[in-house]
Amino acid sequence: MTQPTCPCGSGDPLDDCCGRYHQGHPAPTAEALMRSRYSAYALGLVDYLRDTTLPAQQAGLDLDGIRAWSHGSTWLGLEVENHEVLGGQPEHARVTFVARWHDAEGEHAHRECSGFVQRNGRWYFLDPTVALKLGRNDPCPCGAGGKLKKCCGPWIT
């Protein structure tokens, strides 16, 4: 039996690509995490999308809205334009991409430069749509111990 191709656009079988991350293996790079999140949208894996968002932001996610968008869309493709590791402790990265989908309103393309942070061997998406009630001098919610303004602040405030 032929395995389905991964929705992320790699051309690889799902189980050899993003499927292993969906099953719990940590994504080795921010780009791999971003690709696996696109695949999760295409496959309706809302729990994975929640679990790969910065833990301090997870409670603020609209999971019903994510589920409705995921299931109500036909996912047409992903193009990664750039992946940049920024370094630091904790390590940060940026991934610029274009995601395409079709829904009841037509065909769409969304270009985004997303921020990611690595903590304890796992990459997390920094969701700019989930507000955190923190001041710039408060400890960063990623748990690194530094101030928000010097750590993840540029991505989530």
From Swiss-Prot:
SUPFAM superfamilies listed in its UniProt record: NTF2-like, Sec-C motif
Pfam families: SEC-C (PF02810), YchJ_M-like (PF17775)
Family note: Belongs to the UPF0225 family.
HAMAP family in the record: UPF0225 (MF_00612)
Name the record gives this protein: UPF0225 protein PA14_50900
Species for this entry: Pseudomonas aeruginosa (strain UCBPP-PA14)
